[in-house]
């Protein structure tokens, strides 16, 4: 049984990353992108990166991360970028699938302490009704995005690859809805500059989330997002469609773009 760890030492993280890379066929590029199931032992690399970035930014230590995200570890799907030259993780995104414990963003809205309009909670049924969500199994929760500061200006070249494997996974799992809690400035850039169809989740205002101020819970209709991406980047759209032209779809652990 996999132990879900948020407090590895740097040498432990680096050794696990090197082992992970030894199991993959890599191209000639410096950065490689992968999808990793939350139950995979290698997902601890992404958990470690989450903790490092969140602790540096907001003081969220391993105990806090385990408390907040531990209940969702087995229903998580990580998208991870690895620096194959230095053999260290360069970025990690966590999507949470629906499970008996629910989707974290929606569960938190139904909590009288964590809700954006606390002490008033927003019931799960109200969120579903507000956005026309019939089945939470077709919804992803964009739980975390962690990029170490030294890589934040170096990942532009991998952005398209990362978005591609995420889109492939979403299409494979027939995901129709997306929820998340994002920094309000990120929401403004995504919505006003990039034109992404993000709207406040259940009409909620910005709020403080996990000690980080100025956050916004958001919703997006996934087919609209994918359609927009396809129109704005025709080559990526064609590559996604080509990937799904084959009868056999790859499993998440086979998704890798170089």
Feature map (PLM): residue ranges:
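C-terminal/domain-terminus segments
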Residues: 25-41, 45, 51, 65, ...
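Acyl-donor binding region in acyl/amide transferases
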Residues: 106-216
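Short amphipathic alpha-helix that is part of the acyltransferase structural core
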Residues: 12, 17-67, 74, 78-90, ...
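Extreme N-terminal leader/anchor segments
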Residues: 1-4, 11-13
């Amino acid at each position: 049984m996999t132990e879900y760890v948020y407090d590895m030492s740097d040498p432990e993280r680096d050794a696990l990353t090197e082992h992970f890379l030894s199991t993959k066929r890599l191209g000639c590029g410096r950065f490689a992108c992968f999808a990793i199931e939350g139950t995979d032992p290698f997902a601890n690399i992404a958990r470690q990166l989450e903790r490092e970035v969140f602790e540096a930014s907001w003081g969220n230590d391993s105990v806090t991360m385990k408390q907040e995200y531990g209940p969702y570890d087995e229903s998580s799907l990580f998208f991870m970028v690895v620096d194959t030259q230095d053999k260290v993780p360069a970025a990690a995104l966590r999507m949470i699938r629906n499970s008996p414990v629910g989707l974290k963003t929606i569960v938190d809205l139904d909590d009288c302490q964590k809700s954006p309009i606390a002490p008033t909670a927003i019931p799960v049924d109200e969120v579903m009704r507000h956005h026309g969500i019939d089945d939470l199994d077709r919804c992803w929760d964009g739980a975390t995005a962690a990029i170490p500061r030294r890589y934040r200006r170096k990942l532009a070249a991998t952005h398209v690859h990362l978005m591609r494997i995420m889109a492939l996974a979403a299409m494979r799992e027939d995901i129709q809805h997306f929820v998340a809690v994002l920094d309000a400035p990120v929401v403004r850039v995504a919505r006003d500059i990039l034109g992404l169809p993000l709207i406040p989740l259940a009409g909620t205002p910005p709020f403080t989330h996990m000690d980080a101020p100025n956050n916004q819970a958001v919703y997006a209709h996934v087919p609209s997002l994918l359609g927009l991406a396809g129109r704005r980047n025709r080559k990526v759209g064609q590559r996604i469609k080509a990937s799904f032209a084959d009868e056999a779809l790859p499993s998440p652990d086979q998704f890798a773009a170089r």
